[in-house]
């Protein structure tokens, strides 16, 4: 315990060598790559490039000279390609960072999966209540928390890429401070949720169950926020595997707690056992990451809690606000489909819960690579490698397309049996089976949308992502969806077709922005932020 508190509140930086975000290159290759982009890490100064771009013995001399061409917005990908070895290297880096993250996010998603699975077999009213509870938690809290935490995708990754690891810890402390303040209004909303849902004309029985669920779930929100912030703090430093190990223990624990607290004949207490199980799991995950940071054999720089975290909050607030705008609008449009399904009846709402849980589960795979892409691009920008960051974004899009097609094909192949995992109600099963072909197409578009959003966060363009989310979801797709559902009585099919329309619009806008990005300007903006921490 003495070691724990001494590290937690230490005023002196942790000793130990800070791992380089690009330690996979040799020292000579790192020097030459830095010179290509006019950035010398040892002097921390920007110098205009004046030598050909070379990658050691990786690429022939003719290609090395061609690579010295400075990329300008609007050029074709073929003109900017840095040679197959470099593309292969960036792909391997994304796979290295993304593979453990896929496992971690699938395990984390299984926590929601197991809750819906457990409550679904209590009855469709309980399944509908869990759907509304999940929607409420996502819109009113978790999306807001994720928006704040997304600021670390920009600030922390670029600080670590610039070899300023202690700035990463300061950014984490500022993030936790903002999250603590935001939890107060969240708790007030959840305490009065039953009355809010009745005012919104939801079924009184479902509203009552949802209100009881969320009053207990207030205990889960801080655990979720702390875990997500610490997770992003480690990911920003290229540390992914320990998060997977923690979730390998947490996911089975959540399943066990769901059984004991919901179904066990002696200690179980039914419906309210589910939020208690989730809250316990969230806090277990947070405590495990805190212990890892304090006692890990891998040096994780931590300067102790500092008053500096209370100063110069404007960059963090700037990226947090635009991150919230980007994620909240996207999540709200996604989760509002449950509210719309609630107007269609209990069976469509229960079906929507299964459909949203299924998409959420498979979404974790492309989203994991979106996090890996954001981290990799942030490191490259922080270390002054604008051209490599641009190339990495192209590789990330190609990888996302392959993964998303695989996910969509998987859900289409298992459409006949998937719904029975959640419920035995024949009416709900018929609706779910009917929607699955449309759902498979949505999964493809949603995966590309996820990676595009991750790249925007890695480059510090959350504000553009927010505008894209608002435009694609609310100004375009929502009016079309309402018109189709109301006037043509298409039900859930119309809702999911509207979601596909929103994703396609967002993908088009994201790709246009990233394709025309001035990456050297992004690099200079990042360097300016790093000098004003």
UniProtKB/Swiss-Prot annotation:
Keywords: Membrane, Phosphoprotein, Transmembrane, Transmembrane helix, Vacuole
MF term (GO), any: transmembrane transporter activity
One Pfam entry name: MatE
Region of interest (Disordered), ranges: 1-26
Main location: membrane
InterPro entries for this protein: MATE_euk, MATE_fam
Coiled coil stretches, renumbered: none
Membrane topology: Multi-pass membrane protein
Modified residues (Phosphotyrosine): 25
Chain positions found as Phosphoserine: 20, 23, 26
CDD domains attached to this UniProt entry: MATE_eukaryotic
Source taxon at top rank: Eukaryota
Record flagged with keyword Membrane: yes
Cellular compartments annotated: Vacuole membrane
Any single GO CC term annotated in Swiss-Prot or TrEMBL for this entry: membrane
GO annotation, biological process: xenobiotic detoxification by transmembrane export across the plasma membrane
Keyword hit for NADP: no
Transmembrane parts of this sequence: 178-198, 213-230, 242-264, 274-296, 313-333, 353-373, 394-414, 435-455, 466-486, 495-515
Entry similarity comment: Belongs to the multi antimicrobial extrusion (MATE) (TC 2.A.66.1) family.
Protein's name in the database: Uncharacterized transporter C323.07c
Taxon lineage: Eukaryota, Fungi, Dikarya, Ascomycota, Taphrinomycotina
